Design a protein with these regions (language model features):
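Conserved SAM-binding loop
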Residues: 5-6
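Conserved SAM-binding strand-loop segment of SAM-dependent methyltransferases
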Residues: 9-21
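A conserved beta-strand element that flanks and buttresses the S-adenosyl-L-methionine
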Residues: 32
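A short, conserved alpha-helix within the catalytic core of class I
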Residues: 39-50
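Conserved beta-strand signature within the Rossmann-like core of class I S-adenosyl-L-methionine
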Residues: 58-66
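Short, glycine-/aromatic-enriched active-site segment of Class I SAM-dependent methyltransferases
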Residues: 65-85
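Short alpha-helix
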Residues: 84-101
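Core SAM-dependent methyltransferase catalytic element
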Residues: 100-102, 106-127
Length: 127
């Protein structure tokens, strides 16, 4: 993934690290995660760490999740892919965000259709 990202140009800096043990020396205005959190054993712990240690005051976390209970089309993914995936309900993800210390927490579904419940998007801000 890093090689692919670097080959697309730009001036980004990419590195490989364990998300659960990584300690950032910097804080950030915006952190975005897409299709990551449900692979973690304890996403609540990671989101709390991001809220407390990685975001600047006024910084925002935005997370996109396609594998969640209300999205029935995603229920077979774990078996098809052969990788453990955490299946939570929308309200459970919302509670994780609210209990992490983030404020102004919002959520919505993006790109829903007849056969797809949509990407669950959650966001919150550090005060």
């Amino acid at each position: 993934m890093i090689i692919n990202a670097e080959s697309n140009g730009g001036n980004g800096h990419y590195f490989l690290a364990n998300l659960n043990s990584y300690e950032s020396e910097e804080t950030f205005d915006l952190i975005h995660s897409m299709e990551v959190m449900y692979y973690l054993e304890n996403p609540a712990e990671t989101i709390k760490k991001i809220s407390e240690s990685w975001l600047k005051p006024g910084g925002r976390l935005i997370v996109g999740i396609d594998h969640y209970y209300e999205n029935k089309a995603s229920h077979s993914w774990q078996e098809k892919v052969g990788t453990p995936m955490l299946m939570l309900k929308e309200k459970e993800w919302l509670n994780i965000f609210k209990n992490s210390g983030l404020n102004e927490v919002e959520y919505w579904r993006s790109n829903d259709s007849d056969n797809w419940a949509g990407t669950l998007v959650l966001t919150g801000m550090k005060k």
